[in-house]
């Protein structure tokens, strides 16, 4: 799958993988800082997030292969890799399967263990949104409000909505 990414700077390649419900621009301010420090920074929208394609297949092995495809397509070698939360799981899987491609690995806010489901209310809220009839983010927010009371969480989820 061809993932959407943003690139800034030049130097040692640094790939940044966001967490669940995140997207590439979550890391814009740090990407600029890393670019100033001599990195070619790739902030990536993982599958089913941001501007990357959506697909029913969605597991860490598949997601790591998506990142591998990006590395290959961009002719990158020995990348530094930062993964946050879900992106950390993807980064760890990539590092295990393709250690020769990874120079440095930084995993933020996750560990290599199984976690029980804990986003059930968020998933129920997202499943309740019928995008075939909604036309605006405000309409989606109204549906989400039936499940999620926290303003910040709702806004974070709404940021990931794109009509094509």
Predicted segment positions?
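Alpha/beta-hydrolase fold catalytic core
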Residues: 1-14, 36-39, 76-77
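Active-site glycine-rich loops that stabilize anionic/oxyanionic intermediates
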Residues: 11, 19-22, 85
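Structural cue for short, hydrophobic secondary-structure segments
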Residues: 16-19, 43
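Active-site loop signature of alpha/beta-hydrolase-fold enzymes
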Residues: 22-23, 47-52, 113
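Active-site loop/oxyanion-hole signature of alpha/beta-hydrolase fold enzymes
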Residues: 28-36, 40-42, 46-82, 86
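Flexible "cap/lid" loop of the alpha/beta hydrolase fold
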Residues: 92-97, 101-137
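Conserved alpha/beta-hydrolase catalytic His-Asp/Glu region
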Residues: 132-164
């Amino acid at each position: 799958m061809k993932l959407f990414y943003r690139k800034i700077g030049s130097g040692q390649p640094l790939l940044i993988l966001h967490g669940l419900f995140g997207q590439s621009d979550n890391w814009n301010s740090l990407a600029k800082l890393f670019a100033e420090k001599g990195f070619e920074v790739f902030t990536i929208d993982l599958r089913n997030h941001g501007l990357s394609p959506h697909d029913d297949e969605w597991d860490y092995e598949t997601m790591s292969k998506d990142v591998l495809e990006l590395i290959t397509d961009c002719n990158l070698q020995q990348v530094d890799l930062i993964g946050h939360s879900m992106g950390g799981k993807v980064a760890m899987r990539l590092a295990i399967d393709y250690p020769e491609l990874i120079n440095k690995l930084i995993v933020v806010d996750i560990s290599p263990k199984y976690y029980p489901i804990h986003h059930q209310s968020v998933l129920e809220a997202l499943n309740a949104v019928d995008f075939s009839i909604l036309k605006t983010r405000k309409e989606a927010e109204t549906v989400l409000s039936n499940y999620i009371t926290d303003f910040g969480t709702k806004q974070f989820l709404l940021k990931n909505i794109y009509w094509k």
